[in-house]
Amino acid sequence: MSKEKFERTKPHVNVGTIGHVDHGKTTLTAAITTVLAKHYGGAARAFDQIDNAPEEKARGITINTSHVEYDTPTRHYAHVDCPGHADYVKNMITGAAQMDGAILVVAATDGPMPQTREHILLGRQIGVAYIIVFLNKCDMVDDEELLELVEMEVRELFSQYDFPGDDTPIVRGSALQALNGVAEWEEKILELANHLDTYIPEPQRAIDQPFLLPIEDVFSISGRGTVVTGRVERGIIRTGEEVEIVGIKATTKTTVTGVEMFRKLLDEGRAGENVGALLRGTKREEIERGQVLAKPGSITPHTDFESEVYVLSKEEGGRHTPFFKGYRPQFYFRTTDVTGTIELPEGVEMVMPGDNIKMTVSLIHPIAMDQGLRFAIREGGRTVGAGVVAKIIK
């Protein structure tokens, strides 16, 4: 058993606990690490080690998060747990800790609460497609019918937000009893781990996705043509392949005639690498920072979208005053700022620093985007908000 945990060949999956405050997210996180360490090897983490989560800064936003790791026989998991509700919202919107799937903790003694609903909705908006439910504190509920009612309520809530309510795995357990080593409740943690392994599909690695490179700089090299540089966000680009230049202007096609890294010519550039791509027959002035090079047909330019946004508080260096409809900040996508206007939800007149809000944005230039793309909201180069594209309108 001891050999297994050093094998890094297992698929790596990112998960996290979500749910209403005091429903037992952190206790469950501790229980998972403890029970899985006991059965499959790895390190257990005590409740208080997880609970005093260190502060992190993601894009200037202060978020408290705890990261733990654990193994099942087939996978390695990185798991994020946040102590406060605001931390969750910030985390989900900024994508500070990516989640391929989530464990929604619902106390059987309370049933779904307002934050339960908000976390499910956020999951839907930002594209956490796989959520497993852990019905916690079941040791404190004697009435089987009550458990069934709570379970039904949770399933209905999921269906309401376009999740597969009937097929969502729900585990009835007690994180505290499992943490205390009670065998029947430890079993429930193993059941949960089994759902993690089977319900959340293996995430597609960045390298297996269609090629995309956000353009950071454009150079003209005499006798050779135009070179664009940037970090490959996903996929692989090979010399001789056709690409599209997408965003800001009308989409055009060209061929990559060379890929270089550190002044050496390569056959290909891969996700995560900083490369220069030499483009055939493309003039320096036809391309600009903020556009992307992409596999033809894989991404399209858009101006109007719905988004979930977190507005930085004054303490985080954000605005000191609210903003109103008609607000025109810059929206920073990948490598560049684009001006846009906002529409607030019906009945919302103003947005205060520290709020999270759904807003519809119209940009003055189209940007290559798909659902889940993160952006910053800026005023004169200063970040005042963070957001994620929830739905493309046009």
From Swiss-Prot:
Binding site for GTP: 19-26, 81-85, 136-139
Family annotation (Gene3D superfamilies): P-loop containing nucleotide triphosphate hydrolases (3.40.50.300), Translation factors (2.40.30.10)
Pfam families (alphabetical): GTP_EFTU (PF00009), GTP_EFTU_D2 (PF03144), GTP_EFTU_D3 (PF03143)
Root EC class: hydrolase
Organism: Pasteurella multocida (strain Pm70)
Subunit structure: Monomer.
Catalysis performed (reactions): GTP + H2O = GDP + phosphate + H(+)
One cellular component (GO) term of this entry: cytosol
Annotated segments matching region G3: 81-84
Residue span of region G1: 19-26
Subcellular location(s) per record: Cytoplasm
Source species, domain of life: Bacteria
Keywords: Cytoplasm, Elongation factor, GTP-binding, Hydrolase, Magnesium, Metal-binding, Nucleotide-binding, Protein biosynthesis
Region described as G5: spans on this chain: 174-176
Region (G2): 60-64
Listed InterPro entries: EF-Tu_GTP-bd, EF-Tu_GTPase, EFTu-like_2, EFTU_2, G_TR_CS, P-loop_NTPase, Small_GTP-bd, T_Tr_GTP-bd_dom
Cysteines engaged in disulfide bonds, as pairs: none
Domain tr-type G: 10-204
Annotated EC: 3.6.5.3
Major localization listed first in the record, in broad terms: cytoplasm
Record bears the keyword Nucleotide-binding: yes
Entry protein name: Elongation factor Tu-B
Renumbered residue ranges of the record's region G4: 136-139
PANTHER family linked: ELONGATION FACTOR TU, MITOCHONDRIAL, ELONGATION FACTOR TU-RELATED
Keyword flag GTP-binding: yes
Gene: tufB
Gene Ontology terms, MF aspect: GTP binding; GTPase activity; guanosine tetraphosphate binding; translation elongation factor activity
Taxonomic placement: Bacteria, Pseudomonadati, Pseudomonadota, Gammaproteobacteria, Pasteurellales
